[in-house]
């Protein structure tokens, strides 16, 4: 299986768990989930700009 695909699946799972947390009835969990979702979104948009080199490194 392509390693890039596995990494993307893992990120999707992580994002889903953060979404779950962001909509929790617990205020602490909500703040925590929203914060990490924001961090992940910033990270992903940064990664996408240099995506060629990222994919090349994973496929080697």
From Swiss-Prot:
It comes from the Eukaryota. This is Putative uncharacterized protein DDB_G0280597. It comes from Dictyostelium discoideum (Social amoeba).
């Amino acid at each position: 299986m392509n390693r890039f695909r596995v990494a993307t699946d893992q990120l999707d799972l992580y994002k889903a768990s953060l979404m779950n947390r962001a909509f929790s009835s617990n205020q602490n969990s909500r703040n925590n989930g929203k914060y990490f979702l924001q961090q992940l979104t910033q990270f992903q948009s940064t990664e996408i700009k240099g995506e060629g080199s990222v994919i090349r490194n994973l496929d080697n």
